Amino acid sequence: HGAKCGVVVKQCEDELAVANMAIGAGHAGVRAMCGTSGGGFALMTEAIGMAGMIEAPVVFIEVQRGGPSTGIPTKTEQADLNQVYGASQGDYPRVIIAPTDTTDCYYTAVEAHNLAEKYQLPVTIISDLLLSEHPETIEADALRHDVPIERGEIISEWPEAEKGQFTRYALTKSGISPRALPGTAGAMYVATTDDHDEEGVTISDVFTTTSVRRKMQEKRMRKMDAVLAELPPPKLEGPPDADVTLVGWGSTEGVIREAIVFLTRQGLRVNHLQLKYLHPFHSKEVSEILRNCKRTICVECSYTGQFARHLRAETGFSVNRLVLKYDGEPFEPHHVVQQVNAILEGKSISTDLTMDEAREMAYHYIRVHLADKVRPAKIEMIDGDSEKLWLVEVVGRESDKEEGELRIGVETGSIYSWQPFKVMSVGASSG
């Protein structure tokens, strides 16, 4: 459908090529975007800094999955936040947005392109595998096509005899300089990854002009004031005098809302703060909301609570507790409900292996070592030497006869032993 829609979709040889080609397209005047997951984004980060330096509009989509490295590429997580914040070296203007559902993804993409072109900077949409791949039913008229398109100021010509040399990076009060597409009459300039003066002439080859560097860096970063003013601040959902405030970001919005329904039925007063615009951040507005909350719990899919740390860095506010998940599966409402109740009851959140998890670990061992010829049956907890154990009875898939026992650590999850009751044939099945 590319020709019909006026869109070019290109599969490049690697992530470096993708990022640089998208930036080049944005520089040339095309609305350009590219998408990747965490590993690919790691390779793109130097190029993203180039977009910040040459002030090229471009949109990146970073879909988080379980890491580090290849990790679990078919499972979800929210643990790339530090990487997205730290993309490329140095300070440069950029926007980071975390959409909350499928419909929001559509409008966020439109908004991202408008921001990129209006303010001449890179925009990163940070999603996750759950949001990027799950099916979702929406209303037929939820996605409108009459969306606003804002391309920013693009000059069509530059009368050099009248105005002098074109200053692509003019030091303006707004920080936004006149943009000319390649080939514009009279508007020749140099776009380079080195810092430069107003005409694009580099200031770091032979000598570094510190005053030019300072004013150029201030000019670039001035854009962020206008960007922040344009982005809508977050709003607190629910009763203002709630006993508990659940804080989330990105794709956790739906599951938090559903969990609140169940918590409300239990008699709790719960409200909800969901953050979408991560950079620039509405520090003042968020601080005012949080300091009036009685008890705050941050819900996110990461081990270290990356968003809670970012929240503290931006506002100085530390949430009271964390509800975390990092097994690759998304939150379901009961996960949030159970952990919130445990926190309110003063209980520690257990990381011990549950019976269901022990069954899953038994299935994994069987697939790897026993050629799927058996299955876990009865499971019970017993005492062990260094920790309690899950004793898993293993039976034949077809015969249902006892074939052996697995012992799995309740605390560590370690497979301590497999004890067959008789010698088994574990070669590849003919099926």
Give the ranges of each region predicted by the language model:
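Exposed beta-strand-loop-beta-strand "reactive/processing" segments of non-cytosolic proteins
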Residues: 372-411, 416
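Short, structured coil segments at secondary-structure junctions
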Residues: 5, 54, 91, 292, ...
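Thiamine diphosphate
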Residues: 1-86, 95-116
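Flexible, low-complexity linker and terminal segments
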Residues: 108, 113-348
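A short acidic/small-residue loop/turn micro-motif
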Residues: 421-425
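Short, non-transmembrane alpha-helical segments in secretory-pathway proteins
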Residues: 349-381, 430-431
